């Protein structure tokens, strides 16, 4: 079990309260698909992903990015039970979608970049450390069924 300090919890929940899930989720997923183009193979049904412009303008990328970040919000609400919170999603991504678990880490790193860009003043080194810890815990929870 992961131990969260009161300060870490406050930094995470405080910033999360300011996040526009639709915008940040869309940006994070779009960046994943652009920066790591091999991840596009999991989104073949999304249509045109042929260029950064196409990806950024793709409504399915935007909708799924919102869905992903909404799920991430479940981690913020359940900091003390992230492993169980993501048990079903881990199973889905492992057994049905066959997503490489390394992609969870990549998306977490991209989320850090998006948050830093959107919340420059609030995203202090302490805040970044708390969020880095969170994205690692979420990535580990999502990869759990792979072990």
Curated annotation (Swiss-Prot):
Red blood cells. Keywords: Heme, Iron, Metal-binding, Oxygen transport, Transport. Involved in oxygen transport from the lung to the various peripheral tissues. Heme b binds at residues 64, 93. The keyword Methyltransferase does not apply. Heterotetramer of two alpha chains and two beta chains. GO terms for biological process: hydrogen peroxide catabolic process. Pfam families: Globin. Belongs to the globin family. CDD domains: Hb-beta-like (cd08925). GO terms for cellular component: blood microparticle; haptoglobin-hemoglobin complex; hemoglobin complex. GO terms for molecular function: haptoglobin binding; heme binding; metal ion binding; organic acid binding; oxygen binding; oxygen carrier activity; peroxidase activity. It comes from the Eukaryota. Residues 3-147 form the Globin domain. This is Hemoglobin subunit beta. PANTHER family: HEMOGLOBIN FAMILY MEMBER, HEMOGLOBIN SUBUNIT EPSILON.
């Amino acid at each position: 079990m992961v131990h969260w300090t009161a300060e870490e919890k406050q930094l995470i929940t405080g910033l999360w309260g300011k996040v526009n899930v639709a915008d940040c989720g869309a940006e994070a997923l779009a960046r994943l698909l652009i920066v790591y183009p091999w991840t596009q193979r999991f989104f073949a049904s999304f249509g045109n992903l042929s260029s950064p412009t196409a990806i950024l303008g793709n409504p399915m990328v935007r909708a799924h990015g919102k869905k992903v970040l909404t799920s991430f919000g479940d981690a913020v609400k359940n900091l003390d039970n992230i492993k169980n919170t993501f048990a079903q999603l881990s199973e889905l991504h492992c057994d049905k979608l066959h997503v490489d678990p390394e992609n969870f880490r990549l998306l977490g790193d991209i989320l850090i970049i998006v948050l830093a860009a959107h919340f420059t003043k609030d995203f202090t080194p302490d805040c970044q450390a708390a969020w880095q810890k969170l994205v690692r815990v979420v990535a580990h929870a999502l990869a759990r069924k792979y072990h």
